[in-house]
């Protein structure tokens, strides 16, 4: 079965009160539309057609890197009209209609829905709710067969009592779609062309409407305002938390933990409260992450420990290495096994060899640091001259005294030592002591200044 997917994303979202198109508002670091596209891709369709309208250029720009067919809906005349705009591009056997503001839909749910579709059968995703206000109602005959969908504004009081609502997500044989689209009418309370009217047409044409339901009603929850958006965010985070815990992660409090990207985890991982994982993050076995940390686009090897209030971005931390508290690893930072980065240490494009240590109050930028080298407190690599950046190279077993300024480009060779308070501008050769500071003078009879008395 070949598949085309149509995603409706033309709505304005006035209740969001935002210049940003509704479907671009984020859930877990990705736009709502981005989540829907991600799920759609996993179904391996031959085409994904995104119907856009309000904020069309913003949507195109945000998703320019995706392989999508954008279809313009100049006037928002209803869901049926929106799908009709995509008709010329549809060539597959089956069409699946999704919504750009329903980001939590599970791939497994869509697979079950698609399994219902045949030449003589549609698949319709419905949801049973205690309060289905706003949802179109699923009307069934005495035998339980779906006969129609009635929109809430057009429903009678008896129909409004029905608890089964229409999610809007449906799959159908493409060969029938063009005929049904041509027969749609806008004779309703909204004056719009409802996609849901194809259900009654299908029944009249002798097709069966087979229904499927999501395991969790939140899968089909949309977001029309900021409150609903926050509800989607929290539900997504709790769902991701459950997934990680099932894989061997201990979360101190799943309600105070956020995933905003793609996370791969090992076993016996411990994550404390208020931790944010962004982008592509790989966490191997036995890693411990303290509270209030952000980990972005990074790899944490087995046994890594990250202490409280640390920010790790674009970094690789080797087996048994540690960072923090209050450490910052910026893009290009690599810690080999058992390397240590302590409190108030910042790394940028720096490579620390096995067992190297930078314990506190240090900036290491554009630096190559050999195994077992020790960096004293207050050390700074002066890597930028206002126009270009330069590297600092330290060999193995180097000892850098406290309060050093290492003016790049500069090399401190294996086994060398620099004295505390030095400004190193030249090579310190292997085994040498580098001292670069003014000689101390003690002045006899010196008196401190006294405050001038006011008259």
Curated annotation (Swiss-Prot):
Record region (N-acetyltransferase): 248-455
Primary role: Catalyzes the last two sequential reactions in the de novo biosynthetic pathway for UDP-N-acetylglucosamine (UDP-GlcNAc). The C-terminal domain catalyzes the transfer of acetyl group from acetyl coenzyme A to glucosamine-1-phosphate (GlcN-1-P) to produce N-acetylglucosamine-1-phosphate (GlcNAc-1-P), which is converted into UDP-GlcNAc by the transfer of uridine 5-monophosphate (from uridine 5-triphosphate), a reaction catalyzed by the N-terminal domain.
Binding site for UDP-N-acetyl-alpha-D-glucosamine: 8-11, 22, 73, 78-79, 99-101, 136, 151, 166, 224, 330, 348, 363, 374
Pathway: Nucleotide-sugar biosynthesis; UDP-N-acetyl-alpha-D-glucosamine biosynthesis; N-acetyl-alpha-D-glucosamine 1-phosphate from alpha-D-glucosamine 6-phosphate (route II): step 2/2; Nucleotide-sugar biosynthesis; UDP-N-acetyl-alpha-D-glucosamine biosynthesis; UDP-N-acetyl-alpha-D-glucosamine from N-acetyl-alpha-D-glucosamine 1-phosphate: step 1/1; Bacterial outer membrane biogenesis; LPS lipid A biosynthesis
Lineage: Bacteria, Pseudomonadati, Pseudomonadota, Gammaproteobacteria, Pseudomonadales
UniProt-listed GO biological process terms: cell morphogenesis; cell wall organization; lipid A biosynthetic process; peptidoglycan biosynthetic process; regulation of cell shape; UDP-N-acetylglucosamine biosynthetic process
Stated family: In the N-terminal section; belongs to the N-acetylglucosamine-1-phosphate uridyltransferase family. In the C-terminal section; belongs to the transferase hexapeptide repeat family.
Principal place of residence: cytoplasm
SUPFAM superfamilies (UniProt xref): Nucleotide-diphospho-sugar transferases, Trimeric LpxA-like enzymes
Reaction equation(s) it catalyzes: alpha-D-glucosamine 1-phosphate + acetyl-CoA = N-acetyl-alpha-D-glucosamine 1-phosphate + CoA + H(+); N-acetyl-alpha-D-glucosamine 1-phosphate + UTP + H(+) = UDP-N-acetyl-alpha-D-glucosamine + diphosphate
Protein known as: Bifunctional protein GlmU
Active-site residues from the entry: 360
Protein's UniProt keywords contain Nucleus: no
CDD domains: GT2_GlmU_N_bac, LbH_GlmU_C
Annotated keywords: Acyltransferase, Cell shape, Cell wall biogenesis/degradation, Cytoplasm, Magnesium, Metal-binding, Multifunctional enzyme, Nucleotidyltransferase, Peptidoglycan synthesis, Repeat, Transferase
Its EC number(s): 2.7.7.23, 2.3.1.157
Region (Linker): 227-247
Key word Cytoplasm present: yes
Location in or out of the cell: Cytoplasm
Note accompanying the cofactor annotation: Binds 1 Mg(2+) ion per subunit.
Top-level taxon of the source organism: Bacteria
Pfam family, one: Hexapep
One Gene Ontology molecular-function label: magnesium ion binding
Known cofactor(s): Mg(2+)
InterPro entries: Bifunctional_GlmU, GlmU-like, GlmU_C_LbH, Hexapep, MobA-like_NTP_Trfase, Nucleotide-diphossugar_trans, Trimer_LpxA-like_sf
Assembly: Homotrimer.
